[in-house]
């Protein structure tokens, strides 16, 4: 399972697992991680068609209130749907907290990019070389890094002065659909 792949990568770290799966909870009970059952109200919000946003911020707030006493402790939230993210990458990104208040994984794209029909990173009146374009940065859910203090001040994993840490393939694979799953399987098998 994906969660085991990530836990293997995080071996030796202080790891907390929030799950609604009895199988995962029971599998991790006697392991070197703190596993706790997801609050039913968060499960209900995930399936509530009237609740238009993810309850992830509520879940993080619950975790911080329950388990984190030091408001300056660095919190890293890797996601199991990014199975190829490396501990070394997250450590490198966390080093930026000396200058920035948070860090998020991202991918950089040097392509002619439009948003709502308008150019984002180029002048449409000038033919530029693709390699000369300003990269467009897209957030990737592989990880978010912040402190309890930053989260409480912003009610978000991303603070007011974030660093967007670029990751590349295969670490940037994020499994959101069947095609992503198939790609991850192919990469894993190689």
Please tell me what each predicted stretch does.
Residues 1-19:
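N-terminal glycine-rich phosphate-binding loop and ensuing alpha1 helix
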Residues 58-62, 71-74, 80-169:
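Conserved core of the sugar-phosphate nucleotidyltransferase
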Residues 18, 38, 78, 105-106:
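Generic beta-sheet signal
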Residues 41-46, 110-113, 170-173:
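A short acidic, often aromatic-flanked loop/helix-cap motif at beta-alpha or helix-coil junctions
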Residues 18-19, 145, 175:
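Short beta-strand scaffold positions
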């Amino acid at each position: 399972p994906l969660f085991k792949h990530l836990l293997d990568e995080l071996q030796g770290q202080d790891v907390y697992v929030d799950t609604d799966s009895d199988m995962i909870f029971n599998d991790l009970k006697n392991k070197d991680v703190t596993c706790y059952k997801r609050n039913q109200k968060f499960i209900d919000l995930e399936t509530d068609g009237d609740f238009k946003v993810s309850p992830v911020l509520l879940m993080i707030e619950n975790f911080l209130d329950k388990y984190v006493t030091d408001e300056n402790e660095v919190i890293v939230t890797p996601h199991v749907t990014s199975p190829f993210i490396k501990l070394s990458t997250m450590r490198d990104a966390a080093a930026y907290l000396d200058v920035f208040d948070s860090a998020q994984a991202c991918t950089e794209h040097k392509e002619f990019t439009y948003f709502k029909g308008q150019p984002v990173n180029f002048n449409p009146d000038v033919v530029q070389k693709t390699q000369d374009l300003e990269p467009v940065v897209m957030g990737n859910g592989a990880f978010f890094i912040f402190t309890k203090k930053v989260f409480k001040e912003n009610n978000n994993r991303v603070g007011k002065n974030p660093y967007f840490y670029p990751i590349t393939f295969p670490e940037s694979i994020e499994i959101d659909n069947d095609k992503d799953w198939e790609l991850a399987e192919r990469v894993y098998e190689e």
